[in-house]
């Protein structure tokens, strides 16, 4: 309906949890393609940081370019090696442009699963795929 109102070509982005719910615009196929680095090379290049695992939530503020993601845990890296220290849970935040411009490495391997969901508020959840390549980037954790 919104494509017709805007005079544009429909993209199929309107989805809803069930026929009883309102349709909302949803994103499509957003993930990072594979790069040229192995995970081992990426870890070895880190002076100090964390490798984050099992991301499970995220949201963006399209007006102000903010982003926030959560993950189950992170493994500490010092001098290119895992230390054995784990932090949990992990909350990452920042600005989309800062995050994207800080990406310095992208893994060769790409994993996409169908286990994600796209939520609109607290009542609208639609299954989506998620995943992609691993990224080396700078984010604020806390």
Predicted segment positions?
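N-terminal small-residue-enriched
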Residues: 1-142
């Amino acid at each position: 309906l919104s494509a017709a109102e805007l005079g544009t070509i429909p993209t199929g982005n309107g989805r809803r949890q069930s026929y009883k719910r309102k349709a909302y615009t949803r994103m499509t196929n957003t993930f990072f393609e594979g790069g040229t680095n192995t995970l081992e090379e990426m870890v070895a290049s880190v002076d100090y940081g964390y490798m984050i695992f099992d991301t499970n939530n995220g949201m963006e503020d399209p007006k102000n370019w903010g982003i926030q993601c959560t993950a189950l845990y992170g493994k500490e890296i010092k001098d290119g090696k895992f230390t054995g220290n784990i932090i949990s849970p992990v909350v990452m935040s920042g600005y989309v442009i800062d995050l994207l411009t800080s990406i310095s490495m992208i893994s060769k391997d790409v994993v996409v699963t169908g286990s994600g969901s796209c939520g609109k508020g607290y009542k609208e959840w639609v299954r989506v795929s998620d995943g992609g390549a691993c990224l080396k980037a700078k984010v604020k954790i806390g």
